[in-house]
């Protein structure tokens, strides 16, 4: 789960991480009032969406008086920002962060991520702050420094100091930088983050080390023990189809293709997408109905797939282990009738009660194309959608 920058900064502040003072605003008048309350000569007006690259897209403006705050708030609120992370459709700006300006001396990057290769949390840092870390990794990887953290003891002070020296934090500010990184690590662990990224971390003319931006992502599987974080969820920033899928315990991820996929099991779902690509098709989604799908779940899965206007055909690929093929067949028939399906539908069933499942489909009188194997099904649906 993602949260907004201003929410991330509030979380970090509770762990002793230094962040600029700021207030969230949902209207132009609230933005002006927030700037008045901050009482600083310079304010930064920042669009709040779940995506990076806001500055380049015109979503971050420096205001030197209240009139400029009003002008920038009017120009940003309600507009659609398109960045490299939003996709071409962009995201509508519905809230702003009004923040005090900083006398920036130098920008850095600091982040905590999970390294799956070593099964450890890794602290990464670079003195090339303010730019995409992926770009730094590609062009100048030698400028990225890493410290792998032993989960038994956590981030150690000497590791944070080594990072601070490696990225050339001024000596007089190393202590602050170490405190910053230790607080960031505590937040990462205690809040079950999957990413905690500060880009940029800055040193200021007043001799402070601060987080000028904050990106925190949380492990959705751990949200049951973080009710405070769950309350920060902004459904406006999430895909409506993903939200609907989560209500029925369906795992849905939208893609850019035109072949809808309904599969049970994440591994089979990925294999299904691979084989569709192999036969020169393009999957429109990843949709895992899980091991205990009911007729109701299958119907909802169909509705979610069909809500994507790019879908030109559907491939149902089910291996019946816990799930029985006859139950799936009945669900497919019920769903087809309910939604009035007119698109090509290819169904491949294998496993428990497979013959009964095929018999139910064959006797349904509906225009359902049966497939004998996954490869056969993929070829048929690719052919049908043209």
UniProtKB/Swiss-Prot annotation:
Its EC number is 6.2.1.5. Signal peptide: none annotated. GO terms for cellular component: cytosol; succinate-CoA ligase complex. Its cofactor is Mg(2+). One of its GO terms (biological process) is succinyl-CoA metabolic process. Pfam families: ATP-grasp_2, Ligase_CoA. Residues 9-244 form the ATP-grasp domain. GO terms for molecular function: ATP binding; magnesium ion binding; succinate-CoA ligase (ADP-forming) activity; succinate-CoA ligase (GDP-forming) activity. It comes from the Bacteria. Binds 1 Mg(2+) ion per subunit. Keywords: ATP-binding, Ligase, Magnesium, Metal-binding, Nucleotide-binding, Tricarboxylic acid cycle. Mg(2+) binds at residues 199, 213. It catalyses: succinate + ATP + CoA = succinyl-CoA + ADP + phosphate; GTP + succinate + CoA = succinyl-CoA + GDP + phosphate. ATP binds at residues 46, 53-55, 99, 102, 107. Pathway: Carbohydrate metabolism; tricarboxylic acid cycle; succinate from succinyl-CoA (ligase route): step 1/1. It is an enzyme of class 6 (ligase). Belongs to the succinate/malate CoA ligase beta subunit family. Heterotetramer of two alpha and two beta subunits. Succinyl-CoA synthetase functions in the citric acid cycle (TCA), coupling the hydrolysis of succinyl-CoA to the synthesis of either ATP or GTP and thus represents the only step of substrate-level phosphorylation in the TCA. The beta subunit provides nucleotide specificity of the enzyme and binds the substrate succinate, while the binding sites for coenzyme A and phosphate are found in the alpha subunit. This is Succinate--CoA ligase [ADP-forming] subunit beta. It comes from Bacillus cereus (strain B4264).
